[in-house]
Structures are given as C-alpha cells and as structure tokens.
C-alpha cells in the first residue's frame, strides 16, 4: 500500500497560512484609487448603463427600448399622446382683448384703423396738371403774389391750400435746412418754391400763408411749421398752427377711425390710390438746384393728393351734418341727444336707416 502513496513536501503550518494570505489579497485604499484612475469617464458611463439595463424589473426588450429612447431623447407614442392631451386642456395664452384707441373702431363694427387694414394693390396716383417751379427770390415773390390775388377773388370765406415741405437728410448730420415749399390751391396746378438761394423768405410768400382766407392743411403739418420757423425766423409757427388742419386728425373725426395717419395711408383709405414713396427720391438732395423731374413730380403729388383728400373729407362732413339735421327734424332734439350719447357710430347707422 505504501507504493501508492504520494509523498507531499513537508510544509509548516505557518507556510500554509502565508499561502492562503497570498491567494486572498485585501484591497487597500491605495489599490481602489488606482482602479478608479484606470476607468475613464466614458467607461464609467457604460458601466452605469449596463447596471441600469441589468435590473431585475426590466426584461430584455424593455431595457433596449428605454435605453435607446433615453439616448436619442425621443418620446414614445404614449408620452406624445399625453403631451397632446395636456396642451389641449391648457391652451396657450392669447393676447389681451382690451379695447384700445387703435382697435376701438373695429370693436364698434366701424371702419378699421390704418394699421389693421390688409394691404391691397391700388392704382398709383397720376398727376397730369401743371407744375410751376421757381428758385429765385423775385420769381417766388411774384408767383406768391399771383396766388394771393387768386385767393382774394374766390367767393368762399375759406380757401383750402395744401402745404408741404422737403429738406435733405443725412444719417451723419441729421436734417438739413428747409429746401422746398410746395403748395396747391387748385388740383390743376401745383407751385414748387426752392429755398436754397434764399436767406430770407419773400414777404409775399409769408403774406400768402398767413392770409385770413387761406386754410393750410397737410399731414403732421404742425411739425413743418416749427421747422420752417427754426430755419426762417420771420415765420411765426404759432400763428400758422392756430388755423391749420391736420388731415389725419380730421379723418378720425369724420370717419370715426383711430390712430395716426401718414399721407400715403390717407390716400389709400380716402382716395383708394397708392403713392410712389420711393426712398431714392424721398431721401434725395432737395437743396441741389435744379430739381429733376422725379423730384418735381414727387413734390407736386404730395400737395395734389392732399388737396383731393381735403375736398373729400369736406364733402363727407357736409353729408354727416345734413343727416344729423334731418334726424333732428324727424325725431326731435331730445332724441338726437339720446342717440348721440350712445355713440357716433350708432348715430351714423340711424342716419342710414332714415335715408
């Protein structure tokens, strides 16, 4: 039996214990720090993903589907349906429906303000009348005297005169000196006076614009008078402002509109015509003599269409007053005051019914 026995090398008990210690090595803090250094951020992220995918609550299909959705930042059909239901229950906030000055006319069912109107294609204004253009002081004085004599011959107590001004503008230096005055008392003729060579306005021109029968009108005309006074102190802006008519303000009174008007929008609204407000001409050198054909036509159309707008608003005002008088005769003064207290729009509707 001894021949089948295998002799093992003699070892001490201490040696066996040391062997076991070598096999089972304890991790020291230094060793864990080294392992942490070996793992890059990318490897750590992959480990976290694998740990999340290997949870017992998730099956294989669920793990792959959810992880891919998380990485691609996509929504499942269920999540999309939930979002749609939430949006339908909580719609986005709308703008305030508070009635303002610009929307008051639309709220009353009246004429929309110029800002609310949809743009439409309108025919351009074509002026075929005469254009009388002067650059020298004596010529301007003679022309202004002729116009003043024509005004005095008119039977009307008030003679409307369209008034406008032009001047050069630079983004570096700002507005230049008043260079052009254009007027129109008859739709068949426009007068253009270039002031470049003038140090002082002719007395005949000052007398014309201050004539008691002349009613100057335009859009934002008060600002023109103030600039004219700054450039030519012999003109009194306050005296001209007292008797002038701003067409935009007058339109709001007659047509029950709101907001601020430009001459271009007034032409669209009142005359159903479009104006060619080319920036090339509008920002051109108005102080250079002579003015070219495009500049002359631009200046003439501004006062021509202003005169047309004035005549149209004047006729509308006469019609409105006539309707009010007829309503008073048929229904009495008390009924008229009661209806007017309800608003101008209501009164205009009543006038349409009675007519």
Curated annotation (Swiss-Prot):
Chief localisation class: nucleus
GO cellular component: nucleus
Positions bound to Mg(2+) 2: 164
UniProt-recorded name of the protein: 3'-5' exonuclease
In-chain residues carrying the UniProt-annotated modification Phosphoserine: 105, 113
Domain 3'-5' exonuclease residues, every copy: 147-315
One example of a Gene Ontology biological process annotation: negative regulation of mitotic recombination
GO MF entries: 3'-5' exonuclease activity; metal ion binding; nucleic acid binding
């Amino acid at each position: 039996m001894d021949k089948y026995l295998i002799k093992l090398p003699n070892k001490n008990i201490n040696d066996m214990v040391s062997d076991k210690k070598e096999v089972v090595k304890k991790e020291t803090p230094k060793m864990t720090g080294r392992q942490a250094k070996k793992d890059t951020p990318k490897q750590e992220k992959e480990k976290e993903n694998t740990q999340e995918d290997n949870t017992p609550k998730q099956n294989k299909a669920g793990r792959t589907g959810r992880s891919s959705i998380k990485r691609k930042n996509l929504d499942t059909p269920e999540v999309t349906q939930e979002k749609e239901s939430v949006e339908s229950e909580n719609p986005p906030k709308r703008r305030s429906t508070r009635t303002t000055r610009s929307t008051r006319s639309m709220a009353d069912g009246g004429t929309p303000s110029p800002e609310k109107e949809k743009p439409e294609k309108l025919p351009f204004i074509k002026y075929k009348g005469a254009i009388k253009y002067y650059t020298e002081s004596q010529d301007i004085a003679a022309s202004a005297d002729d116009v003043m004599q024509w005004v005095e011959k008119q039977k009307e107590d008030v003679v409307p005169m369209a008034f406008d001004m032009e001047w050069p503008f630079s983004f570096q230096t700002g507005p230049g000196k008043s260079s052009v005055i254009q007027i129109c008392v008859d739709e068949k003729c426009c007068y253009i006076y270039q002031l470049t060579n003038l140090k002082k306005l002719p007395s005949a021109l000052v007398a014309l614009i201050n004539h008691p029968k002349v009613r100057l009108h335009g859009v934002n005309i008060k600002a023109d008078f103030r600039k004219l006074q700054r450039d030519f102190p012999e003109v009194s802006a306050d005296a001209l402002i007292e008797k002038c008519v701003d067409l935009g303000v007058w339109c709001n009174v007659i047509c029950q509109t709101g907001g601020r008007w430009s001459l271009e929008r007034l032409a669209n609204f009142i005359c159903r015509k479009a104006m060619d407000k080319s920036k090339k001409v509008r920002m051109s050198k108005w102080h250079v003599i002579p003015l070219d054909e495009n500049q002359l036509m631009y200046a003439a159309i501004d006062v021509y269409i202003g005169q047309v707008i004035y005549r149209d608003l004047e006729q509308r005002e006469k019609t409105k007053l006539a309707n009010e008088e007829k309503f008073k005769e048929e229904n009495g003064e008390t009924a008229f005051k009661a209806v007017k207290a309800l608003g101008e729009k209501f009164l205009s509707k009543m006038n349409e019914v009675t007519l």
